[in-house]
Amino acid sequence: MFSRFLKFIIPPFTFRVFFRRIFYSNLKKVPLEKPLLFAGNHQNSFMDGVLVGSYLPQPIHYLMRADMFKNSVARFFLQELNVSPVYRFEEGLENVHKNIETFKGIYSILKQNGNYVVFSEGICVQQKRLQKLRKGTARMAFGAAEEYGLDVHIVPVGINYTYPAKFRKEVLINFHEPFSIRELQELYKISPAKALLAFNQRVEAGLQEQVIIVKNPENDWLVEQLLIMGRNNYVLPFFKWRFDSDNRRLLEKEIAEKINLIDKTSKTALDTLTSKVRTYFELLAKNRLKDETIARKLDWGTIRYLSVILGFPVFVVGYLSNLIPYVVPRLICNLFIKDLRFYSSVYIGIGTVLYLFYFPLVLLIAGLIGGWIWFFIGLLIPLTGYLVLFYQEVVIERFQTFCFWLMKLKNPKRISEIEHFRLEILNALEEIKLDTTSNQQ
């Protein structure tokens, strides 16, 4: 019951506020009428599972490491959220046998054509790299097939964040082609060890296709700057927040793969490109400019400047009326959450619960003090708070555009130099050709 209520609240409201955009693509590939195991990469604690399952038509179930269930209050809420404990060797060998009960519960759900989100890496790491897959997911799938004859389908899911611990950023979720556990059952009868290995190879291959991977950590900075430039080449609808297209992920995947390629084949080309990118962003910083402004060459935008002026009263009202639920989660997370893997999950959890108490309380106070008129005015508080987010974006964008045009009037040669550097970088990136006939992973 609690999980259904949160599914009604979090995807359409909480996610709309926390994420600037969500790209949720290729769900049509998933056979929703089958028992399903969604096998995703793991970057962002509890957030990953919630994102994968939020837009599925049926209830979603999760696995979480058992040490999160030690507290009785936490255990109650996790169970209400359809979360099952999984005991790892890290929790002690004496506890691993408890997974038998967990697996029985999982099989019971799968028998009803239910589903589970699992993270085969077994560890949450905020890197653009996959970790070695563990065998728990494979054992779960083979167990369901062996004991109950279930045609479990495994769906690799790529989860890619622009910045996983930051507010108003983006996340890209893409579903890979599923495979049936029955495809590996004959091998399992002959050699369970080989079947487990083959299972992980299938999942890993799917994840490698869906996840944006930077193989060499030394290239993280370079890839990130190129991703910023790639994103800024495209203007998306301003108010739209959910997209079904996979084009954005493919763009970012291609950029990362090109750097992976020249890291392996041409260190000279890599060093040259890195030097150009570094010079370009140093020029931007020195002149207090942003790549977005250079890329889009925005005009003066009289209407947007007018919206900044006319929208200011709405901004003040919306900001002040939503200040507590906006500031408190951030303050708590900044003070107490030192591990960034948990930052956004805690932020969203606190923010959602707080607003569920805050908003009715404000309506009650407004109604008692000002009657029905103020009560109905109070109903606009969430909308004004949402508009504040866009107002802030417009103000920042207008300020950056103003600085750009001011610089262009004062020093057109400098702007031309910066634009030339950007074009050189994009041309150099374009010249790197991937072999589309083979897997570059």
PLM segments and residue spans:
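Flexible internal linker/loop segments at domain or repeat junctions
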Residues: 292, 296-297, 327-345
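Non-catalytic C-terminal accessory region of glycerolipid acyltransferases
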Residues: 2, 95-298, 376, 380-441
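Catalytic core of membrane glycerolipid acyltransferases/transacylases, capturing the structured
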Residues: 2-8, 30-94, 325, 329-338
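A conditional alpha-helix N-cap/helix-loop micro-motif detector
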Residues: 20, 42, 96-100
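Basic/hydrophobic alpha-helical interface regions
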Residues: 20, 54-60, 103, 132
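A short, well-structured juxtamembrane/interface segment
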Residues: 13-34, 428-440
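Alpha-helical bilayer-embedded segments of polytopic membrane proteins, i.e.
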Residues: 303-327, 342-393
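Membrane-interface elements of multi-pass transporters and channels
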Residues: 21, 214, 331-340, 368-372, ...
